[in-house]
Amino acid sequence: MVSKMIIENFEALKSWLSKTLEPICDADPSALAKYVLALVKKDKSEKELKALCIDQLDVFLQKETQIFVEKLFDAVNTKSYLPPPEQPSSGSLKVDFLQHQEKDIKKEELTKEEEREKKFSRRLNHSPPQSSSRYRDNRSRDERKKDDRSRKRDYDRNPPRRDSYRDRYNRRRGRSRSYSRSRSRSWSKERLRDRDRDRSRTRSRSRTRSRERDLVKPKYDLDRTDPLENNYTPVSSVSNISSGHYPVPTLSSTITVIAPTHHGNNTTESWSEFHEDQVDHNSYVRPPMPKKRCRDYDEKGFCMRGDMCPFDHGSDPVVVEDVNLPGMLPFPAQPPVVEGPPPPGLPPPPPILTPPPVNLRPPVPPPGPLPPSLPPVTGPPPPLPPLQPSGMDAPPNSATSSVPTVVTTGIHHQPPPAPPSLFTAVFVLPDTYDTDGYNPEAPSITNTSRPMYRHRVHAQRPNLIGLTSGDMDLPPREKPPNKSSMRIVVDSESRKRTIGSGEPGVSTKKTWFDKPNFNRTNSPGFQKKVQFGNENTKLELRKVPPELNNISKLNEHFSRFGTLVNLQVAYNGDPEGALIQFATYEEAKKAISSTEAVLNNRFIKVYWHREGTTQQLQTTSPKVIQPLVQQPILPVVKQSVKERLGPVPSATTEPAEAQSATSELPQNVTKLSVKDRLGFVSKPSVSATEKVLSTSTGLTKTVYNPAALKAAQKTLSVSTPAVDNNEAQKKKQEALKLQQDVRKRKQEILEKHIETQKMLISKLEKNKTMKSEDKAEIMKTLEILTKNITKLKDEVKSTSPGRCLPKSIKTKTQMQKELLDTELDLYKKMQAGEEVTELRRKYTELQLEAAKRGILSSGRGRGIHTRGRGTAHGRGRGRGRGRGVPGHAVVDHRPRALEISAFTESDREDLLPHFAQYGEIEDCQIDDASLHAIITFKTRAEAEAAAIHGARFKGQDLKLAWNKPIANMSAVDTEEAEPDEEEFQEESLVDDSLLQDDDEEEEDNESRSWRR
């Protein structure tokens, strides 16, 4: 049988534990006492309980654990924790003990009352308009409460009971019934003790205590000076409003006081008794230790520590949302107004009787007679405390405070207005505020129409915004308020701000849209999204390293996406900027959406070019705006073209400026296009840019002017065809130059290969005693060189200008006319039975030339079927012919010539037009004897399209095969001669002969547009 610890009085042991633990423990003694009591209650032997307590309490007490546990068990065994049994009964003991304690406290309060009056005699000058004795009594009583808070050890034996949360909940529910509580913190100690005694006794004892409670001076009694006098009679016109209808919560009420203080000298409030169901008959009679109220929260209306604060904020704390507190504007407050009592139907707001800060100045009194208790104010009125946007009055901050207060204390203020649907407040900036008293010049903007009182509704608590940091102790204002004072309307929900024009010299904080970093041009994340249409072909590059910002590097990268029309490096004076213009929008879009890093540098940024960017940069440049400083600053939209373009270039410019204006030098890279640098300068009258010279700086600025471009297009619409021809001619010449460069490079590579081949052959001939391994390696190298030399020769031959330039003299119309005439003559002679051999050869040559130039249409000939394929271009394996890239840029070493057989003599004339519909034909050789033809297409993709779709001709199948120029590779499988179209398609795509070429060289030279 395990002997259990016997504890006679748990509450007494808990008090003993609290007192014993306080000096040796950092934790809350009352909470730790509960924990120790729970450990001792366990159903174990004394030895086990000792071990358990030592183990569990070592974390809290450490070195003192062993001593405390021994002392605890000694106290339990000897019952020394029980109070000495002097009283005959426990009930009379408790009553006498509490009455004795109450008398001692009253005596202390009476002796200290005079000290309180002396201590705060300075602050009585700032008291609200009320009776001096009442104010002194309330102030001293409040100070006594604060002072008594510090005596924590006196009440450590009275920790909060377990049902404190339930009591608080009951008190909160009691709000809606007939229980009244005070919102203020001015309860005296005797009232707190009376309340707890009410809970522990019967209703008759509660009534006795309520009569004792009536000895305390009521809250709003302004006629008596003796706080213990009990002849209180209400004098207010609203005194008949019972507290049962309008309850005022107690200290621990769920409504937290952030509203303004009381109003009117005759506002009264009665105290009611506790309801019977509020009395806890089973509770212990000692007064519980209430959780300390947060001083910052009660004085300011908020606490910066929030949930981390160890003090009580009440059951309904104000939550300050995540607002940028230091960045808001400082807002002055509305002036106080001393008017009548609150309207009937609303409870009088309770006072907050905490002492004001030392540096608090009284507000400006309104017009009218001052209360007799307030001394007259002389001199200029001091500035008003700042008003929070939620409509609550706040005192000015001290110099050391970082956050303004929300609720003023001890000062008679005007109550806030009734909250509208959107909590708005009208306020003025510092030094330009209006007193909002009666203004004879503008009586319509007085403050008399605003409601004087509002009932605090939990659902309509406004957010606390507009809290700002800084020193708000403003100097007194010497001048009367001006009509043009700046006024701001703040919507606390949408938080929009509109700022009007104020007096000159009033310095205010810069708002978010006035800051210099707002809406910068180079910050793409904050700009308004612009929907670019299909007409934009310009790309803008930023952060290009100077060593990479040159024409050759940029052209090498961006020419893969399409035809470059314009390229400017160091664009707009930025050494790390560039401007790229493509021929079409699709090419520009393909370039900007490419996942590949520009020039292998991931820091280079590519943006769509905005046409207004250059103009915006120039208008915001200080050099260009310099002549306009003396003029009134207008929005950019209202400026004229001359103002946007800057000063007009004068006739007498400096030599350096004249040189830069008249001659397009190569070093002026930022302003010249590719055509200008190559020597093809267009007419200056149709230029979309204009040179603007600033004689003060000696710099040239290129400004894009869309209006000038439109005007030039209207006035010079007659000369646009000639301009288009010039542009086309320039493009052709540029393409020709690039083609010549490519051909020159190929020629150099070919010569090197030939030299290497000769050297290897001579080495083989001279060295007869060479090892077989070395000889085999040299032979292998020679074979590869021979293949490459043959390919290069074919490519150089195909790109030779002599083959196409003499024939390009004829125009398209002339070529079509000559082809039709020859075809007609051939038809007539064949009908007449004459010799047509020479005429047929001429007709074939014309067909070949027309096919090369793309003139030969797919619909010509005698009933040629298009087979539903539509256009002649774009077929194949999806490779296409590029997007404006010249044909010389595509280097494909696979065979492009088709060997065609199995056609009749009558089909010979229509054979070339049949295959011309699949692509551009470079060469055509037809053997009349064997009826064998070799047709060479310009690209491999076109040849593949012709091989796949052109095998069917006039209802019969042609035999198609790739024509291979190298003899040892010319062996054709017998399967290739099969007429089946699907079989030929499979062979043409999978055959090893298509994969025999050098893949690396193909990747280096081929256009990569198909990879996008």
UniProtKB/Swiss-Prot annotation:
Zinc finger (C3H1-type) stretch: 288-316
Covalent link location (Glycyl lysine isopeptide (Lys-Gly) (interchain with G-Cter in SUMO1)): K106
Coiled coil start-end: 98-127, 724-800, 828-852
Domain of life: Eukaryota
Comp. bias (Basic and acidic residues): 106-118, 134-168, 187-201, 209-227
Residues with PTM N6-acetyllysine: K515
RRM domain boundaries: 537-611, 896-965
Sequence ranges of Pro residues compositional bias: 334-388
Region (Disordered): 106-236, 334-404, 465-520, 647-667, 858-889, 970-1012
Modification Phosphoserine, positions: S127, S501, S523, S621
Positions bearing the Glycyl lysine isopeptide (Lys-Gly) (interchain with G-Cter in SUMO2) cross-link: K94, K106
UniProt keyword list: Acetylation, Coiled coil, Isopeptide bond, Metal-binding, Phosphoprotein, Repeat, RNA-binding, Ubl conjugation, Zinc, Zinc-finger
Tissue expression profile of the protein: Expressed in testis and ovary.
InterPro entries: Nucleotide-bd_a/b_plait_sf, PWI_dom, RBD_domain_sf, RBM26-like_RRM2, RBM26/27, RBM26_RRM1, RRM_dom, Znf_CCCH
PANTHER family: RNA RECOGNITION RRM/RNP DOMAIN, RNA-BINDING PROTEIN 26
Name this protein carries in UniProt: RNA-binding protein 26
Organism name: Mus musculus
